[in-house]
Structure formats: C-alpha cells, structure tokens
Design a protein with these regions (language model features):
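PAS and PAS-like sensory/regulatory domains
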Residues: 64-66
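Short, charged beta-turn/beta-strand-edge "cap" motif at the junction between a beta-strand
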Residues: 57-62
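Short alpha-helical linear motifs
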Residues: 56, 90-94, 107
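C-terminal structural segments of small proteins and small subunits
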Residues: 73-101
C-alpha cells in the first residue's frame, strides 16, 4: 500500500490546459486540482522531475499560468505535478478556482 503524500484537498475538474516542458509543447485536461498540484490527462508524457509551465483555461475566460515539477506519470494516461514557486496572485486565483469547482460538485450532489 502506498503512503498518501498529498497535503491539500483536491477537487475534480475538467479544464483545458497546455503545458510546455524541455522538449515539447502539448495539450491536455486538468482533471484533479489542489493548491499544491494537479493531474493532467494527456497522452503526451513529461519526464519525472521535469519542470513544466502549465497554462490552465479558466471557466470564466482567461487563463492561469503555473510552474510545476512532475512527481509521477502513468503511461498513456497522464502525469501529476506539484506546483513550485506560485505567486500570491496565482495562489489566490487557484483558491477561487477550487472554491468554484467545489461549489459545482456540491450542487450536483444535492
């Protein structure tokens, strides 16, 4: 059994994203999000420990830009990243996005 390493609550989302690594610029979908990191559903894989730049499209228009380190990958499915060096403004936007997603999930469950 693996030890749970997550430090922040995650929410399920479906947000279009683009990411750029050392050798590639690719697209995918963020399907799991927290203030600490996310999982990107994509057939294009980054290397573990690779630093990537992530652009996540917001449901209200615009985008948020984040840097993260790949912490694990699942072949032909995607990879998880841990955010690094998030500015205060980006963290605030990330928290708003998570609150928005959490509210949508609660209204569906009700």
């Amino acid at each position: 059994m693996t030890e749970e390493k997550r430090t922040a609550e995650r929410v399920q989302v479906s947000l279009d994203a683009r990411w750029e690594g050392v050798l590639a610029q690719c697209g995918g979908t963020v399907v799991d999000l927290s203030t600490a990191g996310c999982f990107i559903l994509t057939s294009d894989l980054a290397a573990e420990e690779e630093l990537i730049r992530l652009e996540v499209e917001l449901p209200t228009g615009g985008a948020i830009y984040l840097w993260g380190e790949v912490v694990y990958k699942i072949s032909e499915m995607g990879f998880g990243i841990r955010f690094t060096g998030v500015s205060d403004a980006d963290r605030a936007m990330l928290e708003l996005l998570i609150d928005y997603a959490r509210g949508k999930q609660e209204s569906v469950a009700a």
